């Protein structure tokens, strides 16, 4: 089972403060474990513009039609000082890795320098921190019914309103997440 380019959808019973009602986009899943970013937990009062100001990045030439007041997401509980940018394909950046045909991840500063300009990727999601699982850990959590999985959808990733992403991801499975019992059982 390879869950790269899939969503993990937190089950209602998962009450961990970081992962409660979360949708995690899995960027990498292999024999070493898994790595992903939470895509529906924005940081309080912290925007892409704030990140650029803090890093003293002034993208030029600035296109005022491109909004920089988009939220920065809490990617996960690990390394919350590290930035990750999910974006639609663009080959101009130093450390971009293709996750799927329509999604890449970049960790280099050069992508930040394009935000707010016509050179930026068409769609972007900026996160600080990440989520990770050791080899076998995610599979164990799936067996414990902590998560649902579904192939990722770029519309949910980049266009669905943040507050609706958890329900929208579950709807891809034909599920109303609010109707799922928090109790596991056997038929």
From Swiss-Prot:
This is UPF0301 protein ECA3925. It holds the Pfam family DUF179. One of its GO terms (cellular component) is cytosol. InterPro entries: AlgH-like. It comes from the Bacteria. Belongs to the UPF0301 (AlgH) family.
């Amino acid at each position: 089972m390879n869950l790269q380019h899939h969503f993990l959808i937190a089950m209602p019973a998962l009450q961990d403060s970081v992962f409660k009602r979360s949708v995690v986009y899995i960027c990498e899943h292999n024999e070493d474990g898994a790595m992903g970013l939470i895509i529906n937990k924005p940081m309080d009062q912290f925007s892409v513009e704030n990140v650029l100001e803090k890093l003293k990045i002034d993208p030029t030439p600035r296109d005022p039609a491109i909004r920089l007041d988009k939220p920065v997401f809490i990617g996960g509980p690990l390394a919350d000082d590290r930035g990750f940018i999910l974006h639609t394909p663009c080959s101009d950046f130093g450390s971009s890795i293709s996750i799927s045909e329509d999604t890449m991840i970049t960790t280099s500063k050069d992508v930040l320098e394009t935000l707010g300009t016509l050179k930026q990727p068409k769609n972007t999601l900026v996160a600080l921190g990440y989520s990770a699982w050791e080899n076998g850990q995610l599979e164990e959590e799936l067996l414990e019914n902590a998560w649902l999985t579904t192939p990722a959808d770029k519309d949910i990733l980049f266009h669905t309103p943040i507050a609706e992403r958890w329900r929208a991801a579950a709807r891809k499975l034909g599920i109303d997440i609010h109707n799922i019992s928090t109790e596991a059982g056997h038929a």
